[in-house]
C-alpha cells in the first residue's frame, strides 16, 4: 500500500477502505508517513468529506493508536458527557454528582483547561486539598462505592489524534466535520465510555457558530458512536451568551453548589436536567426522559445530590466545609460593579468576549504553563432579555488588581442594550441518529 495512492483516491472523491485508513494512522503515528503527506490527505478530506463508515474507521484507528482505558470492573453502564466547550460551562460539576445520586456510574477523566477559564479539574482544585492523582485501581473502587470519581488524564491515549490535531492547526484543516468528530469521539471511546451524551454548543461563544454547522457535527459524532457500538446522542445548546451567571473557577464552583441546592440559574439548571435525563436513560436507570427528570429533581430536592457531591470531595481529599460555607472558597480582593450606561433590555452578551475579559483577569490559560488565579472572574447580574435601568449593575468583576480599565474596555465591546430583545432559545435540538 502506498500513501500517495490513498491521497489521490480521496482527492478524487472516492471512499477509503478501513485498511487504507488504518495504514495512514499507523504510519503517521510511528513516523513512517511524513507531515507533508498527512497534511495533503487532511486537505483532501477537508474538501471531499468522508462517509459514515470512513468516519467510524478513522475514529477507531485513532482509538487503537494508544492506550484504551478498561472500565469493565465498574458495575453498570458508564455514560460519559462531552461538551464542545463554551463560557461559564459549569455543567460537569453539577451533572456528575447529580446523576451519580440516581445510580449512574460517572467515571470522569478530565483535563486542565486552555482558554477562558480552567477545566473541570482546575475548578475542583479551588477546593483545598482536592486532588485527582489517584491510581486506576482506587478510581474504579471509588466509582463502584460512590458512583462518581474524577481522575486526571494519564497514559498515552489517542497519540494519533494529538499528532494529527497539531498538524491540522497549522495547515488550515481544523474546521472539517469528519476530522473534528473523529478527534472528539476517539478521546471519549479511549477513555472507556459505554455510552456518550454530547452537548454541542452553537452561537458566538461556541466552536460551531451556526446551528447548521452544530447540527452537522452532532449528526457526525452520534453516527460514529452508534456505528462502533457506543449508544450516543447529542443536544445542541445555545452559547451566544455565557451559561449560568458565573465565569471563573471558584465562582463557577459556588454556582454549581447553588445549583445542587436547587438555587442555581434557570438556564444552567435546565441544561443539566436535559443532559442528565439522557444520561439516566442511556444507563438504563429510567425508561423515559420524564421519569429520569423526575428522579433528578427528587435528588436535588431531598439533598441526596449535594450529599453525593460532599462524599465525592471527601473521597478525593477535598475540604467539604466549602459546600455549606462557599465563602471559604478563594475570593478576589476587589469586586467592581460594571454599570449600565443606558436603560432598556439586554440584547447581547457576547460569550466569547466576556470569556476573554475573564481570562484577562487571570481566570484562564493562554499556554499550558500559565498559572490560573482561581478566585477571579465575572458574575452576570443580568442576562439577555432582562430589563435594566441606567446605572444598574450589569455584572460584577472579581479581580485581584484594582485597575481593570482593560477589562472594562473589553466588556464595553461585548454588551448591548436595546429597546427590546428576546431571551434566546437554550436547547435547539436533540439528535439521536
From Swiss-Prot:
Binds 1 K(+) ion per subunit. The keyword Transmembrane helix does not apply. InterPro entries: Glycosyl_Trfase_fam3, Glycosyl_Trfase_fam3_N_dom, Glycosyl_Trfase_fam3_N_dom_sf, Nuc_phospho_transferase, PYNP-like_C_sf, PYNP_C, Pyrmidine_PPas_bac/euk, Pyrmidine_PPase_CS. SUPFAM superfamilies: Nucleoside phosphorylase/phosphoribosyltransferase catalytic domain, Nucleoside phosphorylase/phosphoribosyltransferase N-terminal domain, Pyrimidine nucleoside phosphorylase C-terminal domain. Its cofactor is K(+). Substrate binds at residues 168, 187. K(+) binds at residues 88, 90, 243, 246, 255. GO terms for molecular function: 1,4-alpha-oligoglucan phosphorylase activity; deoxyuridine phosphorylase activity; metal ion binding; thymidine phosphorylase activity; uridine phosphorylase activity. Its EC number is 2.4.2.2. GO terms for biological process: pyrimidine nucleobase metabolic process; pyrimidine nucleoside metabolic process. It is an enzyme of class 2 (transferase). GO terms for cellular component: cytosol. Belongs to the thymidine/pyrimidine-nucleoside phosphorylase family. Catalyzes phosphorolysis of the pyrimidine nucleosides uridine, thymidine and 2'-deoxyuridine with the formation of the corresponding pyrimidine base and ribose-1-phosphate. PANTHER family: THYMIDINE PHOSPHORYLASE. Homodimer. This is Pyrimidine-nucleoside phosphorylase. It comes from Staphylococcus haemolyticus (strain JCSC1435).
Amino acid at each position: 500500500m502506498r500513501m500517495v495512492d490513498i491521497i489521490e483516491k480521496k482527492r478524487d472523491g472516492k471512499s477509503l477502505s478501513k485498511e487504507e485508513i488504518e495504514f495512514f494512522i499507523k504510519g503517521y503515528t510511528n513516523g513512517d508517513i511524513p507531515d507533508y503527506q498527512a497534511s495533503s490527505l487532511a486537505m483532501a478530506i477537508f474538501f471531499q468529506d468522508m462517509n459514515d463508515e470512513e468516519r467510524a474507521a478513522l475514529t477507531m484507528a485513532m482509538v487503537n493508536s494508544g492506550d484504551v482505558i478498561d472500565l469493565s470492573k465498574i458495575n453498570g453502564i458508564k455514560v460519559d458527557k462531552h461538551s464542545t466547550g463554551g463560557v461559564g460551562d459549569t455543567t460537569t460539576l453539577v451533572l456528575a454528582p447529580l446523576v451519580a445520586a440516581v445510580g449512574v456510574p460517572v467515571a470522569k477523566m478530565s483535563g486542565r483547561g486552555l482558554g477562558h477559564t480552567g477545566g473541570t479539574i482546575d475548578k475542583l482544585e479551588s477546593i483545598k486539598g482536592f486532588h485527582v492523582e489517584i491510581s486506576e485501581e482506587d478510581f474504579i473502587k471509588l466509582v463502584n462505592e460512590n458512583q462518581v470519581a474524577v481522575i486526571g488524564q494519564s497514559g498515552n491515549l489517542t497519540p494519533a489524534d494529538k499528532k494529527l490535531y497539531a498538524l491540522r492547526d497549522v495547515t488550515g484543516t481544523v474546521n472539517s466535520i469528519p476530522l473534528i468528530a473523529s478527534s472528539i469521539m476517539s478521546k471519549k471511546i479511549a477513555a472507556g465510555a459505554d455510552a456518550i451524551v454530547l452537548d454541542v454548543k452553537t452561537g458566538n461563544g461556541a466552536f460551531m457558530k451556526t446551528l447548521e454547522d452544530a447540527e452537522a457535527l452532532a449528526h457526525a459524532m452520534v453516527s460514529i458512536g452508534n456505528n462502533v457500538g457506543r449508544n450516543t446522542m447529542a443536544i445542541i445548546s445555545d452559547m451566544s451568551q455565557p451559561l449560568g451567571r458565573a465565569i471563573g473557577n471558584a465562582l463557577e464552583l459556588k454556582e454549581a453548589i447553588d445549583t445542587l441546592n436547587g438555587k442555581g440559574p434557570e438556564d444552567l439548571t435546565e441544561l443539566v436536567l436535559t443532559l442528565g435525563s439522557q444520561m439516566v436513560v442511556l444507563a438504563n436507570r429510567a425508561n423515559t426522559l420524564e421519569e429520569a427528570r423526575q428522579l433528578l429533581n427528587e435528588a436535588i430536592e431531598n439533598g441526596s445530590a449535594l450529599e453525593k457531591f460532599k462524599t465525592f470531595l471527601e473521597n478525593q481529599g477535598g475540604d467539604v466545609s466549602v459546600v455549606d460555607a462557599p465563602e471559604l472558597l478563594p475570593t478576589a480582593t476587589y469586586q467592581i460593579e460594571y454599570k449600565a450606561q443606558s436603560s432598556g433590555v439586554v440584547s447581547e452578551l457576547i460569550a466569547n468576549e466576556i470569556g476573554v475579559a475573564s481570562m484577562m483577569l487571570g481566570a484562564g490559560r493562554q499556554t499550558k504553563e500559565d498559572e490560573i488565579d482561581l478566585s477571579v472572574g465575572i458574575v452576570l447580574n443580568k442576562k439577555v432579555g432582562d430589563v435594566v435601568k441606567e446605572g444598574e449593575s450589569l455584572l460584577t468583576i472579581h479581580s485581584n488588581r484594582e485597575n481593570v480599565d482593560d477589562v472594562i474596555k473589553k466588556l464595553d465591546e461585548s454588551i448591548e442594550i436595546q429597546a427590546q430583545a428576546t431571551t434566546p432559545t437554550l436547547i435547539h435540538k436533540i439528535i439521536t441518529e
